[in-house]
Structure formats: structure tokens, C-alpha cells
Amino acid sequence: MKPVFRNVLAGAVLVAVGAVAGPWIYINLVKQDAPEALTLEPAVTTTVAEAVAESVVETSVEAVAEVSAVDGQWVVAAESVVGYRAKEVIVAQKTEGVGRTSAVTGVLTIADEQVTGAEFTVDMTTLKSDSSRRDRQVNTRILDTATYPTATFVMNEPIELTAEALAGSDFTATVTGTLTLRGVTKDIDVTLIARLIGDVIEVNGSIELVFAEWSIPDPSLPGIVVEDRGQLEFLLRFTR
């Protein structure tokens, strides 16, 4: 084999190896793992909570006091988090893109053992991931946050609160509401888990988004393939 041809072949092999090894090294040795999905912290069971739950079920005088104490408006707290999660493949290496923000505002209203209203707004311009390149794509081509800077959700139907929920147990419900994202408005059903802990209400869940249904263009780029859907995750904390 002639030296010139051998050098060209060796160079081509190095380029090919680099194209495969580079993403593997980045994803497995350099890139931080995607954060875990947003979830409620494990509940702590106490005899006090059990006693309160029993009193609520029995509709005692103490139970009435507990129920009336939660009535009113609850406001989204600063530590609330909303974000996206999408599966990516970078040159045959699987990973996840995750971006989050705490720029969330909203209120939740409780009256007569029902959640009678809830809405929140997210400042989509503040979403941040572990990649500035991804953030630029999200803010421009993908979500066009200059044109659509916020996303909103408004609950459309009340939710009945069980005695256990009022006593502090985890409460699962399907909520019907209206989501507006990237200029598209749709009625959706969201399954969530909620918990009342003292003067804090926590609400956790996720919404599957098929990108085409929300006028979101294919997020893929040369060398990066993104699935055609992702998750809109949220962990909201409401306080007085």
C-alpha cells in the first residue's frame, strides 16, 4: 500500500472513530446525567396524621375545623418547578434533554372540600438545561419564546377532596383543564398526585406532548435525533 493512500486511509479511520467515540465520551464521561423526574418526597406517616384522618372520616368537630382551615386561595411558591424532558440519540448514544424553570406563578382555590379553581403561568423564556446550545434551540426554533413567552394551564372542573386528602395523605386525581403552549390551546386531562402538609400543598404530575400537535417543529438536529414527543413535568408548591 502506498504511503499516501495509507495515510489517507488512516486519517479516515481516525475521523470515523472520533465521530463515534466523541459522543460516547461526552455522554458517558463528560455530560452530567439528566435529573430524575420530578416527584413528591416520600410521605412520612405519623400517629398524629392517622388520628387526624380518623377524626375527619368521623366528621367530628375537630374535622370541621381542619376542613375550614384549608379554604381560601393558595399561591404558587418560589420553589415550584416546571420543565420538559425529551429523549435524544446522539450518534447512537441515548440520553435525555431536560430543561427546567422556577419562574412560575399561579393560584389554587379551595372551598367546601373542593378545589374550585386552579391556574398557573410559566415563563418559558427562563427554561435552562445543561446545554446552552439546546437552550438556544428551545428559545428560538422549538418554542419560539420571543413570540410565545408563557405557557398557561387553567383547571376547568372542580376536584372533590377526600377525607384522607384533607388529613394529609397522598391524593391522586385526574384534572380537566386548558393548556396553552406555543400559541396552541387545547383541553386536556392530567393525572396528578397532591399532598397537604401543614401550610403547604404539593402538586406533582406530567403531561405528554406530541410535538406536532402543539405546532412544535421537530427538535432534531444533524447528529441529534429527538423523539416526536416529550414530557412537560411539574412539581408545584402552594402556600398561603
Could you say what each language-model-derived stretch is?
Residues 2-240:
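Low-complexity, acidic/polar, glycine-enriched regions of mature
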